[in-house]
């Protein structure tokens, strides 16, 4: 786990909080409504979990370069943070349209020492950034590891993303047991879906 590697409190600020939304619960009546504040994770998003696992894999393989894709910029920002933490050289592939829309995250990526590679092909958004990133990785896989930011691409990358992001669920199970003594039988989980990484987790 992240904690056993000594990365928990310092690097991930885990576990992220589980808080009861008292006013909303009272307003709707009946059900208790809780929220897991994953935005407390270092960098402001759950993407740090996947980025950290891939950085550790890259180090374990003896590779010095890591590449990744990003759309809104969070996956790229987190990977640039993880790369900086573990002394890796980093390239982030990003559609030119997304670069124009996501200046704050692009600034953060560059501040962490990573290079943003603009993608001008196709829709000039995430789907093409993923494709260009994979093309680059296939041509440089002897020296470079690839981190896929969402549950897309070859099966192993989907599994790594799902396993690492399941840190959300691992924390949640412990927090529910601490709060209710057991996991409630009538429990409904609601999560947004974009690329699928947090939903998988």
Question: Where do the model's predicted regions map?
Answer:
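Single conserved hydrophobic/aromatic residue that forms the stacking wall/gate
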Residues: 1-7, 11
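Gly-rich Lys/Arg/Thr-decorated short loops/hinges at beta-loop-alpha junctions or inter-strand turns
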Residues: 4, 29-40, 58, 111, ...
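Short, structured coil segments at secondary-structure junctions
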Residues: 6, 86, 112-113
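General beta-strand structural signal in soluble alpha/beta enzymes
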Residues: 14, 33-37, 67-68, 117-119, ...
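Buried hydrophobic positions in well-ordered alpha/beta secondary-structure cores of metabolic enzymes
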Residues: 17, 35, 47, 54, ...
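Helix-rich "cap/lid" substructures immediately adjacent to catalytic or cofactor-binding pockets
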Residues: 20-65
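A short, small-residue-rich loop immediately preceding and capping a beta-strand
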Residues: 42, 58-82, 86-95, 185-198
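Small/polar-residue-rich loop-to-helix segments that shape phosphate-bearing ligand pockets
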Residues: 91-183
């Amino acid at each position: 786990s992240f904690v056993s590697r000594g990365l928990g409190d310092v690097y991930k600020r885990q576990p992220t909080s589980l808080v009861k939304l008292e006013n909303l619960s009272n307003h709707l009546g009946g059900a208790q409504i809780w929220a897991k504040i994953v935005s407390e994770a270092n960098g402001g998003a759950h993407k740090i979990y996947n980025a950290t696992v891939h950085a550790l894999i890259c180090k374990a393989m003896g590779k010095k370069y890591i590449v990744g894709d990003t759309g809104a910029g969070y996956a790229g920002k987190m990977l640039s943070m993880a790369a900086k933490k573990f002394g890796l050289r980093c390239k982030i592939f990003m559609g030119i349209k997304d670069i124009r829309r996501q200046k704050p995250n692009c600034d953060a990526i560059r501040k962490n020492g990573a290079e943003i590679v603009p993608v001008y092909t196709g829709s000039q958004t995430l789907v093409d950034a993923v494709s260009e990133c994979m093309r680059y990785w296939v041509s440089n896989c002897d020296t470079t590891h690839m981190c896929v930011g969402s549950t897309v691409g070859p099966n192993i990358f989907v599994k790594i993303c799902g396993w690492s992001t399941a840190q959300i669920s691992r924390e949640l199970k412990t927090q529910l047991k601490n709060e209710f003594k057991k996991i409630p039988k009538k429990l409904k989980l609601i999560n947004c879906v974009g690329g699928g990484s947090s939903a998988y987790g």
